Every structure is written in C-alpha cells, then in structure tokens.
Amino acid sequence: MKASQFFISTLKEAPADAEIVSHKLMMRAGMIKKLGAGIYNYMPVGLRVIRKVENIVREEMNRAGAVELSMPVIQPAELWQETGRWDKMGPELLRLKDRHERDFAVQPTSEEVVTDIARSEIRSYKQLPVNFYQIQTKFRDERRPRFGIMRGREFTMKDAYSFDRDAEGLKKSYENMYDAYVRIFQRFGLEFRAVAADNGAIGGSGSHEFHVIADTGEDAIVYCPTSDYAANMEAAEALPLVAERAAPTQALEKTFTPEKVKCEQVAEFLGIPLERNVKSIVLAKDTEAGAEIWLLLIRADHELNEVKASKVPGLADFRFATENEIVDAFGSPPGYLGPIDMKKPVKVVADRTVANMSDFCCGANYRDYHFTGVNWGRDLPEPIVADLRNVVAGDASPDGKGTLEICRGIEVGHVFMLGTRYSESMNATFLDENGKTQPMQMGCYGIGVTRILGAAIEQNFDERGIIWPAAIAPFEVVVCPVGYDRSEAVKAEADRIHAELLAAGVDVIIDDRGERPGVMFADWELIGVPHRVVVGDRGLKEGKVEYQGRRDAQATQVAVADVVGHVRGQIGK
C-alpha cells in the first residue's frame, strides 16, 4: 500500500465535543467523521481496523462451529410483540412505520428473528445443536449519545445464537462460546477480564461480560486477586457479616438535627461515624390497587445496587417514589426518613449490613429530627433482609478465597444462557427421541465490533497518539522515507523494503507523500502503526536504516541488509 493511494486526514486538535481519549484520538487520526448525534462515517483508516477485528471474530466463530448468516436490520414488530420486548425495550428501540402503517423495529439485537428462523427450520433433535451468527449493523436510540463510538446509536456487532435440545447441551454451547471469546480477545492483544454478570433486558439464567481493562472504563469490575472470582458491580454479592449483631447499649433518642438532610451532615453534626448512619431509599411498585411503597435501608457509606433491589421478591420493575408519595407514606419530606413511626404501612427491606447493626442512627420521619440508638427487635420489627448494596474494596470474596478489589473496564462482549425465554414465547420447539415436543434451549453471544476500537485505544495510547496492538492495527508497519521525492537512493531502498515486506505477508504502507519528516512521523504516531522503518540518505551512507516500535523510547539502527528480517522478527512473521 502506498500512502499516496490511500486516504489520510489527520487533525492537530480534537473537535470540542470529543470528551474521552478514544473519541479525541479517533477524530484526530481520521478514523471517524461525525455525521450526526451518535452516527459516524468510518474512514479508510478506521475501516481497516474494523475489518481486522471482524476477521479475527469470524475465524474464531467458524473454528467454534458457528454458522454465519445475515438477518435484516429492519424487523417486523409482530416478532417483538411475541416476546413482549416491543413494549419492554422502551424508547431505545427505534420504531418506524412503512407506507402501509405497519410497525417495524430497527434491530439492536436479533433474538426474535433468529428464533423465528429456528422454529420454521428445525423440526427434530437430529438437527441440534446449531449456532448461527452474523456481523451486522445495529441501532440503539440512545437518549444521550456520547463518547464517540463508545456510546453511539449505530454500531457494528457480532451476535450469535445457539439452539440445543436440553440444558446440558446449552451449557456445552455456552462454554464453547466462552472459550471462543477468550481466544478472540487474546488474539486482539488486549488486557481483558471475563466477569459474572446480570442478564438484564435480554433475560435468561446466566451470563458473563468481557471487559477490556482501562482506567477510563465506565464499568466497575470486581475481582479477587487470589482466586478466579470476577463479576461486574451489578452481580457481585456482598456476603453477610460473620459476626453476630451486637447487643444494644444505647437508649432510643429523638435528636434535633436542624436542616441536616444528608447522612454526612448528620454524622458530622452528631459526632458519630458515617457508618453508624442508615440512609433511607423509597421505592414504589405500581399495582392495580395503586402504588405500593417500599423502604430500603442502606448503610450511609454504601451505595444501592438497583439490579439487586429489583430481585427482591415483589420489587421487579420498581420505580423511585415521588416526593408526594414519600410525604404521604412517611409524613415527612426526604432527608428525615426512617423505619420508625411511619404514617402508613410500608414494606421495609434492610441490606445485610444494616440488619446486623445496633445503636444506629436514622431519620425520625419528622423534619429536623433523627433517631439515635436504634435497635432491631427492641425499637422496630426485624426487617426483610437482602443483599442490596454495591460491594467495596476489602469485602470478602464470595468464593471464600480472599478479599475483593475493584478496577475499571469497558464492556465489549457478553454471553448469555437464555434457556427457553424466547423459544417458549415464540413456540420454537422440536421433537425429541421419544416424539415429544420440547422447547429449544437457547444462548446468545455478542461482541461490540466497533466498540472494540474505542476500548483498545482507551487501553493503549500515549501523548503522541494511539498504540495499536499489532493484530488489529490499520497497518503493521510503515516505511517512512525521508526525501522520497528527492533522493533516488532513498526511493530505491524504501521501495525494496516495502516490496519485500509485502512479499512476506506483512501489512505495510510506504509514506510516499513527500511530507516533511516531522509531519510524517507525527501522523503515523497519531494513527498508531506499531512498527516504523525510517530510510534516509544519512543512514544509507553508513548502510543503516532506523527501526522503532511504537512503544520504544529510542530508534534502533539496523543494517540495510537485515532490516526486513529484523522487522519480521519483531512482528512474528
């Protein structure tokens, strides 16, 4: 490849609306151009990276026995209505009507369509297992698209769907895909971690997320450094405390706390540790009889885990109560709420840590007052107890093999055990060995192809630009001739190196644009090509050229006769 026949368009400064490193660098490197909110053109440099990501994904999916197909981006609403996701997905599902007023969805995933294929094509257990996959454009109508391609509205995704005859078969398919994902991310050359996760809106019984580790990641990854335990924050269990609850030592007292509405303010005013305070979170569950009010109690230095809260029996699809609902149920505005002297019946759920507390402080359901010396059993009934909080560093690992630590990650893949969630609702069945009708057991497996680009950059960059892992770099090597248009010797040697690397199967580009050295070097460091060879008259007089890896602090002088072998050795070809 010659740079003069390629398209390179770099910027010295990132656009003002670029917020995170990957967005800034992709815009500056000319990888993407913004077309609209959350919608981007993928320019030639960016598309080359996407194609390399796709090729690795495709090779490993084929190796794992999956079969590629392609499903429509526009899908009939009737299929989504069969599973209930037409209504459940909410506004992030882009809906449209054709000229005949028929409803359609612009796919964010394709569970319904692939299940429709399976129910029409698979009749017998002899046709199972099967795993279909596609690499296809998806659309999610994000309320606030941001961070470039990391949270865009249109994106490319690999989604796969397995169909098995029983739960044991599903487990094998799931493990097969899990192993394939490990190989994929290892081949990408990225530091990653697979973590236990919640299934969310997809539904099903079990799942893992694959996260690229990056300090700028928006997701918290919980792991135990002395074991294999890893989970995302939503799924990480906060274990019950081992110690028994201490006996009361204080009397219940209603204490004046003027205008102290936050737990931190109350703790400071009363001179007690923050962890002796309990914060009250009021939820509402809408029923046919009206809104049912729930009070969740969390230690003041902890945070509510909404996914865990939604799994409390009776709290699925909860919402946060309005201020009017709060005043009506507690007789007090927010800031002074607690589980004692409530105005109306309220279901109280305490986090495991709160249920283990004694002599604690909480709101008195009266403006400017809090209770101190509160104790379960003596001052109020024992609560419903559940794991409601996010774990924190230092908590005991759920596998009992150490304590937890937390790092940041960017989710780029997800595997789910769906079970019969879709096959039963869409009547996707087969006949087993005994001639009996059975629902197919399903799994689904996604990789955010375009999101990989942003995640890789967030993990691999410096002050000069992107540092691509070799496997997904737009080019493996760039040959930079200084004076290509002025020196026959430089041109001849640069062309020779370029040709020999091409013949060896190296993905190489020669910069024949005639740019000044500073501009040329800055462009390729920004774009992030991992290996660079510089050819110049001064070096050639000594029989040398310069080699420098993108992460190297200094260039290495290499004999002209050895440079191709040296570069091939660096990239393993």
Swiss-Prot record:
GO terms for molecular function: aminoacyl-tRNA deacylase activity; ATP binding; proline-tRNA ligase activity. Belongs to the class-II aminoacyl-tRNA synthetase family. ProS type 1 subfamily. GO terms for cellular component: cytosol. It is an enzyme of class 6 (ligase). Its EC number is 6.1.1.15. GO terms for biological process: prolyl-tRNA aminoacylation. Its main location: cytoplasm. It is found in: Cytoplasm. Keywords: Aminoacyl-tRNA synthetase, ATP-binding, Cytoplasm, Ligase, Nucleotide-binding, Protein biosynthesis. Catalyzes the attachment of proline to tRNA(Pro) in a two-step reaction: proline is first activated by ATP to form Pro-AMP and then transferred to the acceptor end of tRNA(Pro). As ProRS can inadvertently accommodate and process non-cognate amino acids such as alanine and cysteine, to avoid such errors it has two additional distinct editing activities against alanine. One activity is designated as 'pretransfer' editing and involves the tRNA(Pro)-independent hydrolysis of activated Ala-AMP. This is Proline--tRNA ligase. It holds the Pfam family HGTP_anticodon. Consists of three domains: the N-terminal catalytic domain, the editing domain and the C-terminal anticodon-binding domain. Homodimer. It comes from the Bacteria. HAMAP family: Pro_tRNA_synth_type1. The keyword tRNA processing does not apply. It catalyses: tRNA(Pro) + L-proline + ATP = L-prolyl-tRNA(Pro) + AMP + diphosphate.
